[in-house]
Amino acid sequence: MFDSSIERVTLELCFHITLSIMCGCSIYFLLLVFILTFYSSVLLHLKLYFFSSDRAIFNA
């Protein structure tokens, strides 16, 4: 009886730890995707801005 309750508590603890790690990893992954998307869009806007300013300089 005592051993089975310890085993059950250990299994529940492992399950909760695994679940929290999975949730943390998914949140971290979503944050990473958001940061990469934001960074690439900013980079794209900067590149377009510099190319358009270069074109304006060359045309003038």
Swiss-Prot record:
Keyword list, A-Z: Membrane, Transmembrane, Transmembrane helix
Entry keyword annotation includes Transmembrane: yes
Localization in the cell: Membrane
Membrane-crossing segments per the record: 19-39
Main localisation: membrane
Membrane-related topology note: Single-pass membrane protein
Listed GO CC annotations: endoplasmic reticulum; membrane
Name the UniProt record assigns to this protein: Uncharacterized protein YGL041C-B
Species of origin: Saccharomyces cerevisiae (strain ATCC 204508 / S288c) (Baker's yeast)
